Amino acid sequence: MKTKEIPIFLDYSQSAPERELCTDCGISRTTDPKRCGTACQFIHPQYESLEQKIHGKTRTDQGEDALFFGSFRQMYRAKLKNPLPGAQWSGITTSLGEKLLETNQVDAILTMAPDALDPWKPTPILITQSTDMVKARGMRMGYAPLLALLDVAKEKGYKRLGIIGIPCQVYALRALEKELSLEQLF
């Protein structure tokens, strides 16, 4: 049984280094900010090679849907039969995160929670207990340095991570996945 850990929130009151096109995914705030040069989809786009590596095919191999949505293995539309309180789209995404933690498929989930003073401001959080996923309910579609928590995850020895984030965060994490020695990434 895992020991009870409280979620780790990121204090990002310090501004990130100024860069054109930067969405502040958080890589520039890590111990090795130079990784932006290889991880950022704006600085070093490598869509086809990452799609091939992750999905076994590229978006150009998949037809019109993939050209619009990006490469995918399978595509589903789903919602919970009984929506959860405080959830945006029924709570299915946070429920998937809960299940990954409950079944020990991941050590932690990187996601966003509301800021204590501004509920619309996304605050990066690293969650290790399924019961804490409730803190991440509700969609906060804004830029925040989620990946700055990768240093904390590494310090804690987390090798299996789930991520609930926006495309530029997921892209950067996938680009660094091998370098980070992750065993599993959901």
Task: Label every model-predicted segment.
Residues M1-T58:
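Iron-sulfur cluster-binding cysteine motifs and their immediate structural context
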Residues E48-F186:
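Iron-sulfur-associated redox domains of electron-transfer enzymes in respiratory
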